[in-house]
From Swiss-Prot:
Entry keyword Cell cycle: no
Free-text function comment from the UniProt entry: Together with the serine/threonine kinase Pkn1, may play a role in the specific interactions with host proteins during intracellular growth.
Protein name stated in the entry: Serine/threonine-protein kinase PknD
Domain Protein kinase: 4-296
One Pfam family here: Pkinase
Family note: Belongs to the protein kinase superfamily. Ser/Thr protein kinase family.
Catalysis performed (reactions): L-seryl-[protein] + ATP = O-phospho-L-seryl-[protein] + ADP + H(+); L-threonyl-[protein] + ATP = O-phospho-L-threonyl-[protein] + ADP + H(+)
Keyword Phosphoprotein: yes
Binding site for ATP: 10-18, 33
Modifications the protein undergoes after translation, according to the UniProt entry: Autophosphorylated on serine and threonine residues.
Gene name for this UniProt entry: pknD
NCBIfam families: PRK13184.1
Keywords assigned by UniProt, alphabetized: ATP-binding, Kinase, Nucleotide-binding, Phosphoprotein, Serine/threonine-protein kinase, Transferase
Length: 934
């Protein structure tokens, strides 16, 4: 241990001691964990201690501290990690135990709202280790470290083991592990290094009775941690050494701490996680996290106002059959369709939730739930306001959002053929509408224009096909605001009257929320009025300028984002939202901006799919808690074909998870939005995630941002010099990464001889990254001979199995050299057309280029006209044959546009088009800005 100078003891556990130490070689502080001296002679505990270090070293996740080095030479047994400043969760909980009065700061830190994101991060880490086949077996507040900068990490992997490892049985045999009867169970808060693996207080009942550990034993420990977060106390605290009679009932969190205002559903989650019977617990950590999602997303508390029966006429003001086409022509599939029509007698306010269930047969015929304003409904104008139309066909459920009789949004998803009923939940809260079917989010819509009192309207053919309708209202929604009067004018489109009252309220309440809210709504009023009159929308910006520096400052940027959105200035819209989030991250109005981001994501999925990727990235970075598990699956499916077209996703076979650094990098690559790359680079560097670092350098090179590339390269050189571990894989991979980066730098500078020297010294996978980047540069710069030689060298040194990865580049070279014979042989042998080519694949485009080289223009047009997706990249490439306008590319995301320009240029070269034609695409490619903002 000569390299390390121990500074002070940080903590002591069942097997080890953790010290703050100074690393003399790297001149930095580290955390050094060594086996306790009184246990160092025990070979089994030494083995378990080293196993702990190796398991932690194999796991790469933000919630796990990476391992720098492991030493087991001679008597010294220790390993080192980054030192994270902070405190344990136990320390935080202990600071409030049995205290009746808390400081404001401590009350905020230990609130249920503050604890939930921390608990979700803990669960995310446990979900990750379970996916890797690892059980922690000693989860407790003492082993949760809360960093000063928001880090939440799980430490102490001494009890961790692989789920199906033989060591489970060996532990029983070697430690004399015996079956503990219920009467012999005692409790303590320290890990027992001998008979029992884990901390008894946090062990599941079956573990204390001798059963093997499982995912459900970790879930039990998570449940206890959640219970403590909710109640600030332990569910069955006993004096040390006292037995726990399981017959005693455990109080629910609500009963244990009624003053904490714990939502009943959250209390139920904790109780389910700590059920004595493992069968009654959550089946997985993923299921536990899914149950937490509504609470993480900040859903309101609702109370039941009324339950309406569709069979009781007393609930309804109108109750009669109607011809659907008369009132809702957009919905009727046949002009002769008659439906039962019901309009509620009761009026609901602006915050309402409607819940019911409908049969599959009813949905096949179509079911409508509408919210017409009372004034229009009383006049028989039932189509006014918002409504939802539910329909299904061919095992696909569709939900349409209707406004004033016009469909403005439609979402569809597949359904299980055997499903007989659907549970519907519609929430209208102020200016936001969310629609769930079987807890799956279908619609999220925000309208900044206020709505007045509304009624409930039901349209259905068979009354037997719908359950009773539960009407819930948000607690506190009945409070009347001084803004209600101008809101009413705005809802009636009386813009001048609304503006006059908003100004009056703004001036009457200086410094208060009513003032800045009135100014924001004044801006929305003027923006709507200008838009309706066909004026210059940018005039509305000055109204939002008045919010600058006020107590409602973030709303300045939200308002400007609305102006830019309606004006079609997407980049400026994003810039405005980012300014608000960067300048006021803790402002009370920031959740409002996060809601707006979510709305824009779902809205762009429906209207501007290229914009959706940017909003996905922003939400992942800023508000990942807003995306539920089901939405993650939906978005992954949406991104699937782009994933197949992304080199680093094909090389690195690790599954692309939605909430991951790899997904953030993936979206940065496709959008050209590189703002978050420095943080991703730092994260990958700190975790020693070499694959991520490789991918990041590839993305930076593809973006063309030489300044960022140079900065990352300098940081990498320093980082690799600091890492000096004898016989370590880190050294080898670090050296390979440095050579790879030097090769990319040489390619950027057109120093091809040096590039070849560096790239030839790295593994084939890294060569493939360089080859892909070089191919774009070589064909655009018309330096194909150099690229061809580079390609041939890599091909000659690669294995037969790896040859398939360079076929696309070989075909490109053959086409460029007009070698029809070789191009045809390579295409027909490796990508035969009769096997069905995927239209977004590279091979599909190359076949089109081959046909172009034969001179058969009509065959080329026929080839690209086969594309099923008329606005997909391959279909758009075919447009360059007859059209020199680049307007049709505007709907593409950044990388799609860049790639389409390259392939269009290549196709026109193969088609022997005049130089001035293909030069248009070449220059457009070269002139593309190297980042999202330019």
């Amino acid at each position: 241990m000569q390299r390390y100078e121990l500074i002070r003891l940080i903590g002591r556990g069942g097997m080890g001691e953790v010290y703050l130490a100074h690393d003399k070689a790297c001149s930095r502080r580290v955390a050094l964990k060594k086996i306790r001296e009184d246990l160092s002679d025990n070979p089994l505990l030494r083995k378990r201690f080293l196993r702990e270090a190796k398991i932690a070293a194999d796991l790469i996740h933000p919630g796990i501290v990476p391992v720098y080095s492991i030493c087991s030479d001679g008597e010294s047994v220790y390993y080192t990690m980054p030192y994270i400043e902070g405190f344990s969760l136990k320390h935080l909980l202990k600071s409030v135990w049995q205290k009746e009065i808390l400081s404001k700061e401590l009350e905020e830190k230990t609130s249920v709202k503050a604890f939930l994101p921390i608990f979700d991060k803990i669960c995310a880490t446990v979900e990750y280790i379970h996916s890797k086949g690892v059980l922690h077996r000693d989860l407790k507040p003492d082993n949760i470290l809360l960093g000063l900068f928001g880090e939440v990490v799980i430490v102490d992997w001494g009890a961790a083991i692989f789920k199906h490892a033989k060591e489970l049985q060996q532990e029983k045999d070697e430690e004399g592990f015996s079956s503990y009867g219920q009467k012999n169970i005692c409790y303590s808060s320290m890990t027992v290094p001998g008979k029992i693996v884990g901390t008894p207080d946090y062990m599941a009942p079956e573990s204390l009775l001798g059963a093997e550990a499982s995912e459900k034993t970790d879930i039990y420990a998570l449940g206890l941690i959640l219970y403590q977060m909710l109640t600030l106390s332990f569910p069955y605290r006993r004096k040390k050494g006292r037995k726990l009679p399981y017959e005693d009932s455990i109080l629910s969190p609500i009963e244990m701490a009624p003053y904490r205002e714990i939502p009943p559903s959250l209390s139920q989650i904790a109780m389910k996680a700590i059920a004595v019977d493992p069968v009654q617990r959550f089946s997985s950590v993923q299921e536990l996290r899914k149950a937490l999602q509504p609470h993480l997303q900040g859903e309101s508390e609702w109370t039941t106002r009324d339950i309406l029966s569709t069979k009781d006429r007393k609930n309804w003001k109108y109750y009669e059959p109607i011809l659907l086409s008369r009132y809702f022509p957009v919905l009727a599939s046949s002009p002769a369709q008659w439906y039962n029509f019901m309009l509620s007698d009761m009026e609901v306010n602006s915050s309402v939730r409607v819940e019911c269930s409908v049969t599959k047969s009813s949905v096949q015929e179509g079911v409508g739930i509408f919210f017409p304003p009372s004034k229009e409904a009383d006049k028989g104008e039932f189509y006014c306001g918002y409504g939802l139309w539910f329909s299904s066909q061919n095992n696909e459920l569709s939900v349409s959002l209707i406004k004033n009789g016009i469909e403005i949004q439609k979402e569809s998803q597949g359904i299980i053929p055997q499903q007989s009923r659907f549970a519907i939940s519609i929430e209208k809260s102020n200016n936001k509408i969310t629609v769930f079917v079987d807890q799956i989010l279908f619609i999220l819509h925000i309208d900044y224009l206020p709505s007045l009192g509304e009624r409930i309207e039901i349209i259905i053919q068979d009354l037997q096909g719908i359950s009773n309708i539960t009407i819930l209202e948000s607690i506190g929604a009945l409070r009347v605001s001084c803004l209600a009067v101008p809101d009413a004018f705005l809802a009636e489109k009386l813009y001048d009257q609304a503006a006059r009252f908003y100004r009056k309220i703004r001036d009457s309440f200086p410094g208060r929320k009513e003032s800045y809210e009135a100014q924001f709504r004044l801006g929305v009023t003027l923006l709507t009025q200008i838009e309706e009159q066909g004026g210059d929308l940018m005039q509305a910006l000055s109204t939002f300028d008045l919010l600058h520096g006020s107590t409602g400052a973030p709303l300045e940027y939200l308002g400007k984002a609305l102006v830019y959105q309606r004006n079609g200035s997407f980049v400026e819209e994003i810039r405005s939202l980012l300014l608000a989030l960067k300048r006021y991250p803790q402002h009370p109005e920031i959740p409002r901006l996060k809601d707006h981001l979510c709305f824009r994501l779902y809205d762009s999925l429906h209207k501007h799919r290229s914009e959706a990727l940017v909003f996905m990235l922003l939400i992942l970075w800023i508000a990942p808690e807003k995306i539920g598990l089901r939405e993650e699956e939906r978005f992954l499916e949406f991104l699937h074909h782009r994933q197949q077209s992304t080199l680093f996703c094909r090389i690195d076979k690790t599954p692309l998870q939605f909430k991951s650094s790899k997904m953030e990098l993936f979206l940065s690559f496709w959008t050209g939005f590189t703002l978050f790359l420095p943080e991703l680079f730092q994260r990958a560097r700190d975790l020693r995630d070499y694959q991520a670092l490789i991918d990041i350098f590839y993305v930076v090179c593809a973006s063309g941002n030489k300044e960022v590339f140079s900065q990352f390269a300098e940081d990498l050189a320093i980082f690799v010099d600091e890492v000096v571990f004898p016989k370590s894989l880190h050294n080898q991979r670090g050296e390979e990464l440095v050579l790879f980066v030097q090769g990319l730098a040489a390619l950027q500078n057109r120093e091809y001889r040096q590039a070849k020297e560096f790239i030839s010294a790295v593994p084939f996978a890294l060569q493939l990254y360089a080859l892909d980047l070089f191919s774009l540069q070589a064909f655009i710069d018309e330096e194909v001979k150099v690229f061809s030689d580079f390609l041939q060298d890599i091909y000659n040194s690669a294995s037969a199995e790896d040859h398939k990865h360079v076929l696309v580049y070989m075909i490109q070279v053959s086409l460029w050299n007009q070698d029809l014979k070789q191009a045809y042989e390579l295409l027909s042998k490796n990508f035969p057309q009769d096997k069905g080519l995927i239209e977004y694949s590279e091979a599909f485009v190359l076949w089109g280029c081959y046909l172009a080289l034969t001179g058969d223009r009509s065959a080329v047009k026929a080839h690209f006209s086969r594309c099923q997706f008329k606005y997909g990249r391959s279909a758009l490439i075919g447009k360059c044959i007859d059209d020199d306008s680049l307007d049709y590319l505007e709907g593409l995301v950044w990388w799609e546009k860049k790639k389409t320009l390259f392939q269009s240029y290549f196709l026109l070269r193969c088609l022997h088009a005049p130089k001035e034609r293909y030069e248009v695409y070449r220059q457009a490619y070269i002139s593309m800005e190297n980042s999202f903002f330019g």
